[in-house]
Amino acid sequence: MAYRDARVSHVKNGIYGSMWVAAMIAKAFETSDIKTIIKAGLSQISSSSRLFKAVSNIIETYDKGAPAETCLAVIRTCYNEEVGYDWCHTISNAEIVTAGLLYGNKDYGKSICLAVGTCFDTDCNGATIGSVLGTAIGYEAIPDYWKNRVNDTLESTLMGYSTVSISDMAKKTLDFIEKSPK
């Protein structure tokens, strides 16, 4: 489904990025092990892709014990807008998400802040980490500080759904899944 959805507006690594995130969220329902979740995402994309190699390099950097600041600084240097990359480039943002998930050590706020503080596509990176990690650790483990600010409300520009309850939308989504043919 992620492939079909992403190909409407993305190509190549943009499509792979969507597939990677969808697979991570799906795996997060089964395990809270961050590396297992990231690798499950990688298992859905081509191992010869630049995205696969970039995310794998971040895992390797983390495994070698490099500090978060060093890892994130390398990403910012390689993909700096001044060297020709756009701030919403899939590869650099996937690297930031990977680093945030790994270096955040399942601390919801720290993980999100590592990604957002690195800049680039801040809203997407924070939301991706929040989605993956929130699923992995469960709603009850998300600190109230983060939940209370949202107040179970989603504001959008989608006609008929401009202000909706997040819990109602989650229930509608679950109902849809349960009614879908297997």
Model-derived features: where do they sit?
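Catalytic phosphate/nucleotide-handling subdomain of diverse soluble enzymes
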Residues: 9-13, 20-21, 92, 96-172, ...
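Accessory "access/gating" subregions that flank catalytic or transport cores
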Residues: 3-10, 22-119
